[in-house]
Amino acid sequence: MNRLKDSPGGNRVVITVIGPDRVGIIAAVSAVLAEKGVNILDISQTIMQEFFVMVLVGDMATATVDLVTLKDLLAEKGEELKVRIDTQHEDIFNFMHRI
């Protein structure tokens, strides 16, 4: 089963995290998502020259908050972690990154 294909496109968000690597970034971001009912469909992370880089696709079908609220909550968490967290609807992300 491909969870990305099975999830309705209108409910997906793309979350990007970039900043200095440190312990607990994935745990902190995942905790916010779990608390607000956002299911993680896909996650990819790497370390590039001491910088943490993560791209996460989440399904908001069961979320208890709207996209704007989630974006604000994650941005606040990013400030706390000293990383940049951007949250976009998947359609916007795809439009901005098409070739």
PLM ranges: what are they?
Residues 1-99:
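A conserved regulatory-domain signal marking ACT and ACT-like small-molecule sensing domains
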